[in-house]
Design a protein with these regions (language model features):
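Membrane-anchoring hydrophobic helices of lipid-metabolizing enzymes
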Residues: 41-123, 133-135, 142-144, 162
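Structural motif
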Residues: 121-123, 167, 192-196
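Conserved nucleotide-cofactor-binding alpha/beta core module
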Residues: 141, 145-188
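Non-catalytic C-terminal accessory region of glycerolipid acyltransferases
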Residues: 43-47, 176-313
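Short hydrophobic alpha-helical segments enriched in small aliphatic residues
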Residues: 8-9, 28-31
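Active-site pocket-lining segments that scaffold enzyme catalytic pockets across diverse folds
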Residues: 126
Length: 313
């Protein structure tokens, strides 16, 4: 009789070569992203050129099929097509043009709840991991001057949207300059802030797609900056391949968030032709978050308020 899977048993040892290959691929992929982050003058994504210029030794060692695979993985062709068709735009106009080019449409409920004279921290679930940030710019960017969204730094590769984003490094140490930029934005009364308090893309948990526990820092930021909090619910999902990879990662005990390697694919391919619904809730005064609960408990309460909006979607 076959023994149950044991992380310390024979079956795991048999999977070690695969585990090591996935880990190496993961590191190479994010090295490329870091290299590309330094190519701010580039108007097109060229994976091979980046490797040749920034990592010549790696370029000499990599076989041609590996470079081709990386181009496919990051959707180089599709992303460059988007840049070519939308490069004349910037900020909200770029997000709107990108959505039109990809035939992505939206339904928005409760937009009137965001008042012009308010001082807000808007929070949302994070089902897509990348394109939901772009979607919010397309929907809210014109309505809310000075909108800044705290996002995965992978999106900083889109030059036309840098003015809207504040980057967070989810796979390494956060840059001091980025941390300081986020702090300045929270203190600026002319900026409306938005964040995804889970910090990671939604997962398949307990039979449904949902965020992991929200970070308590969302409450701390709201109180310290005296911003009322607006919960928002984004109805959408990634491909089954994405969730399958995440399930496979957990089964193998891989700690790295290798699902991130599929985010460009989800954004450039899977999102095409999709319709997303956004539901905006009532502002919650920051004074609500008193000492009756810890910041961690308030963060989970806020998460519940977000998902309660689902019934209106």
């Amino acid at each position: 009789m076959e023994q149950p899977f044991n992380h310390h048993g024979t079956r795991q040892r048999r999977m070690e070569p695969f585990f090591n290959s996935v880990t190496r691929l993961y590191h190479i992929f994010f090295v490329l992203l870091q290299l590309y982050n330094g190519q701010q003058d580039m108007k097109r994504i060229d994976i091979e050129l980046i490797i040749r210029n920034k990592a010549p030794q790696l370029h000499r060692k990599l076989p041609r099929f590996a470079i081709g695979f990386m181009k496919w993985l990051v959707c180089q062709k599709q992303l460059n097509e988007i840049l070519e068709n939308c490069e004349m735009y910037e900020g909200p106009d770029f997000a709107i043009a990108m959505s039109k080019y990809m035939n992505v449409t939206y339904s928005v409920q409760g937009l009137e709840k965001i008042k012009d004279d308010g001082h807000y921290l808007m929070v949302s679930n994070h089902p897509l991991g990348a394109y939901d940030g772009i979607s919010y710019i397309a929907v809210l960017g014109k309505k809310i001057p000075g909108l800044k969204i705290v996002v995965n730094d992978i999106l900083m590769n889109i030059d036309q949207l840098r003015c809207m984003f504040l980057p967070v490094n989810t796979v390494g140490r956060q840059k001091r300059s980025d941390m300081e930029a986020i702090e300045r934005a929270y203190r600026d009364e002319n900026i409306q802030m938005m964040s995804f308090p889970a910090g990671f893309c939604s997962r398949f948990i307990d039979g449904k797609i949902q965020d992991i526990a929200w970070k308590k820092s969302v409450i701390t930021k709201a109180i310290d900056s005296k911003r009322d909090v607006i919960p928002m619910y984004f109805k959408g999902r990634n491909s089954l391949v994405f969730y399958g990879l995440e399930w496979f990662r957990r089964i193998l005990g891989i700690k790295f968030n290798i699902g991130l390697i599929l985010l460009p694919w989800q954004m450039a391919r899977y999102a095409r032709g999709k319709h997303y619904t956004i539901v905006i809730g009532d502002p919650i005064p920051y004074q609500t978050f008193d000492a009756s609960r810890s910041h961690t408990e308030w963060a989970q309460w806020l998460r519940e308020q977000c998902y309660n909006l689902k019934k209106n979607s």
